[in-house]
Amino acid sequence: MEIVKSLQSQKVIKYFLIVIFGSILLTISAKIKIPFYPVPMTMQTFVVLLMGVTFGWKIGVTTISLYLFEGVIGLPVFAGTPEKGIGLIYFTGPTMGYLIGFLFASFIAGYLNFKTNIFFIFTKLILSVSIIYILGILWLGNLIGWDKPLLQLGVTPFLLAELFKISLLTILAKKLIKFRKFI
């Protein structure tokens, strides 16, 4: 019985460390901007999908939830937050829909079956990222008005960057899924 409790404790500690590491990775990916035209690219959506693909939907969603919670309480984890953070005010701003979309995208990416061909993996990752942008546009339209050019503001500038990130993750996906065996 003690062995079972010890193994369960080790598993909980391992999950906890993965979630903390994922949250740190998300924060770093939000803060580092890669020059890209017309809008600088972060690797945030890549990390969101990476967490789901590598560790499954439970750890992926838990990691994103922790990250969002950190931002809501005022830690400067989001892409545009100042050093002192601004919490709920920033969270409910123009990017809230995208941030909520991270949860659903990580969930879908975590449910991927990687025994299929590369085209199918690519398609599922496109679906995952599409959820982020759909929720982002819905919130943005609600916030700034539906009469604004929402696609030009909230989607089009990021399409090439997303295609790059999805392509990279598609190539890595079959290797990353092997990490699930260790958790």
State what each model feature region is.
Residues 30-40, 68-105:
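Interfacial aromatic-anchored transmembrane helix boundaries in multi-pass membrane proteins
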Residues 54-58, 108-115, 175-180:
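Structural signal for the C-terminal ends of transmembrane alpha-helices
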Residues 11-19, 45-48, 59-60, 90, ...:
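Residue-level signature of transmembrane alpha-helical entry/exit and packing/kink sites
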Residues 115-183:
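Membrane-embedded alpha-helical hairpins and interfacial helices in multi-pass inner-membrane proteins
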Residues 52-54, 58-59, 74-80, 137, ...:
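Juxtamembrane membrane-interface segments at transmembrane alpha-helix termini
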